[in-house]
A protein has these predicted regions:
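Short beta-strand-to-loop acidic/aromatic patch adjacent to the donor-nucleotide binding site
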Residues: 1-8
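Short beta-strands and strand-loop turn motifs
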Residues: 2, 30-33, 107-110
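Short, intrinsically disordered, charge-balanced linker/junction segments flanking boundaries
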Residues: 4, 24-27, 194-197
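Glycine-/small-residue-rich active-site loops that bind phosphorylated ligands and cofactors
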Residues: 9, 35-38, 140, 157
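Acceptor/aglycone-binding surface of glycosyltransferases and processive sugar-polymer synthases
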Residues: 11-88, 92, 113-130
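Hydrophobic helical membrane-anchoring modules
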Residues: 85, 92-197
Length: 197
């Protein structure tokens, strides 16, 4: 059982969730947060929604609360998980690992309470959000190299064609001369990069 130690998650549901993991033959059970008013800041809620949606689009996750700090795993899952993160990116790494391995995962939900009075969250909305987004991009290139490099290659080729047409070919057709040599070099370089990407 993995749970954030900030007293915001309900530990009482852990045995029931463990039974659910065993009964449904899951390797990982994510416990989505049902927040009381004021327990979950709007910026964090929006960031969680956007990052979870990004992982769903790229990796096909079925989770609705990817950044929940309450999960239950089998021993086998823990032994196969090569943890590389040391911050709030760990939840993303766990989710992507389970999707990459194509193992059965599930999601349930439990109450999420306000932090105890006087305790302060270590989560920095922007810094940690950017770190998680960079991890998603890095994992996209590691887990799906053909798709990711093909997208970069297509972007470079399209940029090369548009720049070449607007800055080089069209002016050459209209004026019968090439005046923007830097654009020629740039378009050519982008196309070479696109081909060899």
């Amino acid at each position: 059982v993995l749970v954030d130690g900030d007293l915001t998650y309900d530990p009482v549901v852990a045995p029931m969730m463990l039974e659910c993991l065993i009964k449904d033959k899951l390797e990982m059970l994510n416990i989505a947060r049902i927040g009381a008013k004021g327990s979950y800041r709007k910026g964090h809620r929006l960031g969680n929604f956007l990052l979870t949606k990004t992982v769903k689009i790229i990796f096909g996750s079925g989770l609705d609360d990817m950044l929940s700090g309450y999960r239950i795993f089998t021993r086998r899952f823990v032994k196969t998980f090569p943890s590389k993160s040391d911050g709030f990116e760990i939840e993303t790494e766990l989710t992507v690992h389970s999707l990459e391995m194509k193992i059965p995962i599930g999601e349930s939900s439990a109450k999420y309470e306000e932090r105890p009075h006087g305790s302060v969250s270590k989560l920095s909305t922007f810094r940690d959000g950017i770190n998680i987004l960079l991890l998603i991009i890095r994992l996209f290139f590691l887990v799906k190299p053909i798709t990711s490099f093909s997208l970069v290659s297509a972007f470079l080729a399209i940029t090369s064609i548009i720049n070449g047409w607007l800055q080089v070919i069209k002016p050459w057709i209209d004026n019968d001369e090439i005046t923007k040599y830097p654009s020629v070099i740039m378009s050519s370089s982008l196309m070479v990069l696109a081909i060899f990407m």
